[in-house]
Each structure stands twice: as structure tokens, then as C-alpha cells.
Amino acid sequence: MALNEQDVARIARLARIELTPDQRGRAQAELNGILHLIERLQAVDTQGVEPLAHPLSAHEDITLRLREDAVSEQATEARRAELLANAPESADGLFLVPKVIE
């Protein structure tokens, strides 16, 4: 599957980025290269290959370094107000953000 110029223009519009004609051409070539690589990977026979959860897990024991799931600070109305003071807009104790998905 190859992307054409209209596909790249649509992707740029959805990503909300503006591309010059030269950038659009380079992006088209790079994206088509990535899609070609994906097609090659999909063609590889992986029958009988054990799945990996992590690429290094086949060579060493991987232990996740996670912190204890504990409250680190008591949530108070004063703390909430302090945090919301950093927001450009807030309502009902929540951060308001601009709509980014059509």
C-alpha cells in the first residue's frame, strides 16, 4: 500500500501540521518507506517463535521498577486550588483544554 499526495495532505491536516510542497514530498517518501518495512515484517514467518513481552527478556531477567501505589500527598481543596491556578482555564475543579479531535 502506497500513500499518494492526497493521503499525506490528509494526514498532515489531521495532525494539524502545515507542510510545504517539498516537505509533503519528503513525508510521502518517508511514510511509504515505513509502510514498505511494515509489509516486509508482516511477510516474515513467525510460526513457532515464542512471543516476547520485552526484547531483553530472552537474555536476562527483567524486573519492573515500580513504586508502591500509595498516596504521596493528601488531596485538599487548598492544594487543588493551588494546582488549578496554573491552568489557563478551569471549571468545577477540572482543567479545561481545547478540543483537538473533530
Curated annotation (Swiss-Prot):
Keywords: ATP-binding, Ligase, Nucleotide-binding, Protein biosynthesis
Catalytic activity: L-glutamyl-tRNA(Gln) + L-glutamine + ATP + H2O = L-glutaminyl-tRNA(Gln) + L-glutamate + ADP + phosphate + H(+); L-aspartyl-tRNA(Asn) + L-glutamine + ATP + H2O = L-asparaginyl-tRNA(Asn) + L-glutamate + ADP + phosphate + 2 H(+)
GO terms (BP aspect): glutaminyl-tRNAGln biosynthesis via transamidation; regulation of translational fidelity; translation
UniProt enzyme class: ligase
Zinc in keyword set: no
Enzyme Commission number(s) from the entry: 6.3.5.-
Pfam families in the cross-refs: GatC (PF02686)
Gene3D superfamilies: Glu-tRNAGln amidotransferase C subunit, N-terminal domain (1.10.20.60)
HAMAP family found in the cross-reference section: GatC (MF_00122)
Family named by the database record: Belongs to the GatC family.
UniProt subunit comment: Heterotrimer of A, B and C subunits.
Protein name: Aspartyl/glutamyl-tRNA(Asn/Gln) amidotransferase subunit C
Gene: gatC
